[in-house]
């Protein structure tokens, strides 16, 4: 189950209220690295859909629904602690329609659009490979944020208004299209599979491999996905 998954399961068993969820085990990571993405997604598909349905029932909301949306986080969880070495995606399930559902539920447009722009940025970095690989590279999302703040005459992110955050989302998605040649995914399940695979991929990223060598952590252990 990995560290996060095991601890969450244990807290749940002793009655501590934790958000509902599920864990894809470290064994699947090993299979992923052996069989490849397409085969593992095919093998996992039905189980993940059933697990999401269980979370939907507990949360009384629907993944990808525009009226009563369920958002999820997707996190790594190795057996040994590897802080900051692997990847996380938050607010997954958002798109242009779902964000309006969040506004209707919360009554807070700024919260909804800020969550959305953070999700697009995080997904672009982690799943779509737009994160800079060294200090010399410019982060396209951070560059856009600075450009918009300058145009609006503000210095801090939290000074941006709802319409500014909407502009950020639009510009972020245009940057995704320009850099990847593809539109930002709007289907919740397409987003989910991208995130699951990105977490498995992060087990073999350069910084994680180096950290494991330094700490004596075997490559074969793999990471869980929560």
Residue ranges and their predicted role:
Residues 1-226:
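Nucleotide/phosphate-binding sheet-loop regions of phosphoryl- and nucleotidyl-transfer enzymes
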């Amino acid at each position: 189950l990995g560290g996060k998954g095991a601890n969450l399961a244990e807290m749940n068993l002793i009655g501590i209220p934790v958000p509902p969820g599920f864990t894809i085990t470290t064994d699947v990571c090993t299979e992923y690295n052996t069989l490849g993405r397409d085969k593992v997604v095919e093998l996992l598909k039905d189980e993940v859909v059933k697990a999401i349905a269980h979370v939907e029932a507990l949360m009384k909301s629907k993944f990808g629904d525009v009226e009563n949306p369920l958002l999820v986080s997707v996190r790594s969880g190795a057996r040994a602690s590897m802080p900051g070495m692997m990847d996380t995606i938050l607010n997954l399930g958002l798109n242009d329609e779902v964000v309006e559902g969040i506004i209707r539920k919360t009554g807070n447009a700024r919260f909804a659009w800020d969550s959305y722009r953070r999700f697009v940025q995080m997904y672009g970095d982690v799943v779509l490979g737009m994160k800079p690989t060294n200090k010399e590279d410019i982060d396209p999302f951070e560059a856009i944020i600075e450009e918009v703040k300058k145009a609006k005459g503000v210095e801090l992110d939290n000074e941006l208004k709802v319409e500014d955050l909407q502009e950020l989302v639009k510009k972020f998605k245009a940057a995704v299209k320009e850099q990847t040649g593809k539109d930002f995914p709007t289907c919740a399940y397409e987003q989910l599979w991208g995130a699951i695979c990105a977490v498995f991929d992060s087990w073999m990223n350069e910084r994680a491999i180096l950290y494991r060598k330094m700490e004596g952590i075997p490559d074969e252990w793999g990471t869980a996905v929560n």
